[in-house]
Amino acid sequence: YSGKEYFYVVDENHNVTDTLHYGAGQIFHTEIHPEPRLALMYRIDEKSSVKASYSRTVQYAQVASAATGGLPFDVWFPISPNIKPQTCDQFAAGYFRNFKDNAIETSVEVYYKNFKNVIDFKDNAMTYGNVLIDGELRCGKGRSYGVELLVRKNVGKFTGWISYTYSRTLRTVPDINFGKEYRSPYDRPHNFVIVLNYDFTPRLSAAVNWIYNTGQPVTFPYGQYTIDGVTYVVQGS
């Protein structure tokens, strides 16, 4: 590719202050971030143990969801002078115990995640055909927490597992929901899964899967207005 690309520089008030041009082979933006990890395990006895872990992850491409004309769509943004990479610090701990000579496994795990540099479109963002779309983004923070329960049977003709997860994912971003904490698009609190397998013969088996998930959060519009013949939807909180 031998063409040129341009980039709009946005200030802290989300106004365009400059336009930068880049040629083929020219470095656009560079960032370096460490991603440390730590995992610990303590064996209580032959049947039970506890585990704890910490990890930091960095995401160099983020997605923001918007709705134009009532249709939702996602926009991916690479890091740039306007958009910092998203960082996540995750803490997790769990208790694990086996029964009946390790034929049945059980576990309880809890986790907490702290997000920084989370991007999202501001309320009533102008996204359709907007070449200055970076100015419609806002950057904030987020948090996620949950508990996971699991029972698994690995031995015998009848095997399978049952799991339940309760989790929340929340964000706080300026100019969205009046600056108050709100549910992220990934906030689906309940997840319940049942997987059952039965072996009739070495060559014949049957399986049943059942999954229940909480639906994604939705914001319903409460009004609309028209400017120059174009109708815009006003979203609720």
Identify what each model region corresponds to.
Residues 26-33, 82-87, 116, 139-143, ...:
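Short sequence motifs at beta-strands and strand-loop junctions characteristic
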